[in-house]
């Protein structure tokens, strides 16, 4: 069951970058990426990329609803979820939501709530840049930065943390996942780290997670 919260989005955006950084092993927000040439027009690039993903999701969802009605989720891999930190009755914008492409679905069951702990396999990839045409892998949970090691049952090393101790967009995804679900999650910079920069993560980065919920408790 998705928990209800009425904490302000502004407060959460100040709080969550401080909480998620230790979990993902990223450097302090005081660090500077230090290579502006690598990330030319980075904010515009990332904002455009997220808008394209949202447009793709909206089109696919609309077509599935038109063709299959209430059963559309059985025929469409795309989902969009409003941030848990915002009352759904309030009008929002695209950057108030995450965009999800379902890779694999676990068995029917419950989802974590805000106060639960979770174990997650994940890879975090940035948008393509000068030196990384496929996007830099900024962090990952397994022994090597490849899906074959991160998600293989013999090699996976899931990380455990509180559902609440992650970036706003990451938490939003977890609250909708069930054990066994593997999703590609697109998080706009507004629900990620925003203007904060680290040694691995430029400011204004859209976060693209390949993530799998292993269990929660």
Stretches with model-predicted labels:
Residues 2-7, 29-217:
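Cross-family detector of peptidyl-prolyl cis-trans isomerase
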Residues 13-18:
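Sec-dependent signal peptide recognition
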Residues 24-28:
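C-terminal motif of bacterial Sec signal peptides marking the signal peptidase cleavage site
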């Amino acid at each position: 069951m998705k928990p209800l919260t009425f904490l302000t989005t502004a407060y959460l955006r100040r709080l969550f970058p401080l909480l998620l950084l230790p979990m993902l092993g990223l450097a302090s927000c005081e660090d500077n990426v230090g290579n502006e040439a690598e990330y030319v027009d980075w904010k515009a690039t990332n904002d455009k990329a997220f808008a394209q993903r949202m447009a793709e999701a909206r089109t696919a969802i609309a077509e599935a609803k038109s063709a299959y009605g209430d059963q559309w989720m059985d025929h469409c891999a795309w989902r969009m979820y409003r941030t848990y930190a915002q009352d759904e009755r309030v009008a929002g914008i695209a950057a108030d939501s995450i965009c999800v492409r379902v890779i694999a679905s676990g068995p029917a069951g419950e989802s974590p709530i805000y106060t639960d702990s979770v174990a997650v396999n994940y890879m975090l990839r940035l948008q393509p840049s000068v030196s990384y045409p496929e996007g830099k892998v900024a962090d990952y949970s397994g022994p090597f930065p490849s899906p074959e090691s991160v998600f293989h049952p013999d090699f996976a090393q899931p990380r455990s943390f509180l559902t609440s101790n992650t970036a706003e967009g990451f938490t939003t995804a977890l609250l909708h996942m069930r054990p066994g679900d593997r999703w590609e999650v697109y998080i706009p910079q507004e629900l990620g780290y925003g203007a904060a920069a680290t040694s691995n993560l430029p400011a204004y980065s859209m976060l693209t997670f390949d993530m799998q919920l292993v269990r929660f408790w």
